[in-house]
Structure formats: C-alpha cells, structure tokens
C-alpha cells in the first residue's frame, strides 16, 4: 500500500430542509389554520480516528465530501427528516488544518476520537411557526440555512513509541525488519526508505511497542533538504529515539552531530526527547575499531553508547530491552500526568 501523509480535501455539510406553507384541511373544519412543518437539519461532516488505517492515500482519489440536505417540512406540522452525517475515517495521529496550513482545527490522536468539523444547516421554519393573534393564516415559510463548507489539509503524524533516526544507509530498515514483522525495502544505497515504516516489537505477551523507521535525514533536512523536512514531524510523537550510527562508514561523530543538529533545528521539541545512541554494523568492524569509535561517540555525546548488528542480530535483545524499559517508563509517566478523560468515541466540535 502506498503511503501518503498529507492531503487537501473539500468538505461541505448539508443545507437545512425548507419549511413549507400548508393549512389544515378536514371535513367540517372550514378554517383549519396553518400546519406547515419545519425543515430537517442538514447532515454534519464528522471525522473519526480509525486504528486500522495508517495512510491518507484514499484522499488522493476522493477529495470532495458533501453531506445531504435535510428533508423539507410537510403538512400536519411534520418536520422534515434530518440528513445522516458523513463519517470520514482517518488514521490515528491525523491533524486537521485550515486552508492556510497553519491553523489547527483538530488533532485525532486517540482511536475512536471524533470531531464534528462542519455542522449541518438548521431547517427552515414552516408557516405554523409564524401564526400570531393578529396573523391567523400566515403564508410565510423559510428556506433552510446553508451548511458550512471549507477546504482543509489533513496531515498525518504517525504514532509510534520509538523513532529510528540516522543518516541514509545507517541500517534502520534492516534493524526494523529483524526486530519486527515489517518488511521495508532494503538495499545498499541512500534513501532506500522513501516513506515511514511501522513495525511492532513484541518481547513478551504483555510487552510490546511500535517502532517507526523514518526516512534517512541529511544535513539541511529541517529546511527541506533530502526527505527529512517532510518526515521529521513523524518523530514528534515518539517517546524515545533510537539513533543508529553506521560504524563502518568512518566519521561516526560527524554522522551523530549531523542528525542532532537537524533534530535541534526542527521546532517540534525533538532534541529534548530521550535518545539511545547505537553504533551499528559492528559485524563489519574489528574489535579495535568498535572500541575506538564507541569511545569517540561517548565523548562527543556525553552519553553511553550501545553496539549492535542488525545483520547478525548481535546485542539486539539488550537494545530491545532497553527500549522497552524506556517506553514503559514514559507510558507510566504520561498516565500519571494525564487528566481523566471521557471514553473513546466522544465527539468534539471544531
């Protein structure tokens, strides 16, 4: 399935139904009076976060969504039928922006979360509504109120516990394919991964986390160079970053600093996220190279550095356990800090 993380669409809620002019007509009742009913309410445009979706690709082919008009009123004071809402399902983590691409209207960050983005128009009033002591037979009825319409941008920020970052060819796709059931494209050239990939890592029945392989970042990624500007946003929701450094490529300190600079320059608080630095591809290095490059990384970063090999699976279990512990701690801290929330499926309004 193709990946698409942003889309522009048009949405319009339904117009309200029209009120009608009608009079009571029964045998032996010469002047029955007005009994025209009101129009029904137009359909709403509702967005819902669906846990089984992970791309906005469907919106490439369907870009216009319109709800139906409410039913017209009828005699005998009958109100027109309300139109059904149009439910638009999007992946969890989708943000809805106004046409200016800056004003956020909604953030659907929980499965089942809903928002009414455009409210249907109210129905027009029938002539029964306008009856007064001085106007016993009004012939006035209102048209339904128009619905709301707007162009909006959908922007998907994947929700993963761990974000894999590193320069192109750092071994991120290989790592993801080995530790999870994900099958990203793997080859020995830069930018093999053109779209974010998700995988689920299960250490036990009760322990699992979602890991995202973010396409390779390069110098200037935060300004749009390479593929990074588009995909740095996917890292924002991760609890911890696993920074893979290609140990066989040479200058490991420069590689680490390049990515750190891009994370710090991006305005999503990425630099403050917990980071685990891993010296990758130790199967292609001598013990002396592993030791010297590990020490150089630790000196430059001021942090402990783990070593691993995605190809030979060396030290993978230790790294996964470290990631799981960090993710668990972050989840517990977030749970303690979060205020009580209503059950999923609640509706909000934009």
UniProtKB/Swiss-Prot annotation:
GO CC annotations on file: cytoplasm
EC number per UniProt: 3.6.5.-
CDD domains, A to Z: Obg
Primary location: cytoplasm
Localisation: Cytoplasm
Residues involved in Mg(2+) binding: 173, 193
Keywords: Cytoplasm, GTP-binding, Hydrolase, Magnesium, Metal-binding, Nucleotide-binding
Spans through the membrane: none
Name of the top EC class for this enzyme: hydrolase
Cofactor: Mg(2+)
Residue stretches making up the OBG-type G domain: 160-328
Obg domain residues: 1-159
One GO MF term attached to the UniProt entry: magnesium ion binding
Disordered: annotated segments: 331-350
Cited function: An essential GTPase which binds GTP, GDP and possibly (p)ppGpp with moderate affinity, with high nucleotide exchange rates and a fairly low GTP hydrolysis rate. Plays a role in control of the cell cycle, stress response, ribosome biogenesis and in those bacteria that undergo differentiation, in morphogenesis control.
Family label: Belongs to the TRAFAC class OBG-HflX-like GTPase superfamily. OBG GTPase family.
Subunit structure: Monomer.
Protein name, UniProt field: GTPase Obg
Native organism: Gluconacetobacter diazotrophicus (strain ATCC 49037 / DSM 5601 / CCUG 37298 / CIP 103539 / LMG 7603 / PAl5)
Gene coding for it: obg
């Amino acid at each position: 399935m193709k990946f698409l993380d942003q889309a522009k669409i048009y949405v319009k809620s339904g117009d309200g139904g029209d009120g009608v002019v009608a009079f009571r007509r029964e045998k032996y009742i010469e002047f029955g009076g007005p009994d025209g009913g009101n129009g029904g309410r137009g359909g709403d445009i509702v967005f819902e976060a669906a846990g089984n979706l992970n791309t906005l690709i469907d919106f490439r082919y369907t870009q216009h969504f319109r709800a139906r008009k409410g039913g017209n009123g009828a005699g005998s004071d009958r109100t027109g039928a309300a139109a059904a809402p149009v439910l638009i399902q999007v992946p969890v983590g989708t943000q809805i922006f106004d046409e200016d691409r800056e004003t956020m209207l909604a953030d659907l960050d929980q499965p089942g979360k809903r928002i009414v983005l455009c409210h249907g128009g109210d129905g027009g009033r029938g002539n029964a509504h306008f009856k007064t002591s001085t106007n016993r037979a009004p012939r006035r009825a209102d048209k339904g109120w128009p619905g709301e319409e707007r162009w909006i941008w959908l922007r998907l920020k994947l929700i993963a516990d761990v974000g894999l970052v590193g320069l192109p060819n750092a071994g991120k796709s290989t790592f993801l394919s080995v530790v999870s059931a994900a099958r990203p494209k793997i080859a020995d050239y830069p930018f093999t991964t053109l779209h974010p990939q998700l995988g689920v890592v299960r250490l036990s029945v009760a322990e699992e986390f979602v890991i995202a392989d973010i396409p390779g970042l390069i110098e200037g990624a935060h300004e749009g160079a390479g593929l990074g500007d588009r995909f740095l946003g996917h890292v924002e929701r991760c609890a911890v970053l696993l920074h893979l450094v290609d140990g066989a490529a040479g200058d490991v300190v420069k590689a680490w600093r390049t990515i750190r600079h891009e994370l710090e320059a991006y305005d999503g608080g990425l630099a403050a996220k917990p980071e685990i630095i891993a010296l990758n591809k130790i199967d292609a290095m001598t013990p002396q190279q592993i030791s010297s490059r590990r020490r150089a990384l630790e000196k430059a970063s001021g942090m402990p550095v783990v070593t691993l090999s995605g190809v030979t699976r060396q030290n993978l279990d230790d790294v996964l356990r470290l990631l799981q512990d960090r993710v668990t701690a972050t989840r517990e801290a977030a749970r303690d800090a979060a205020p009580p929330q209503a059950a999923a499926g609640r509706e909000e309004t934009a």
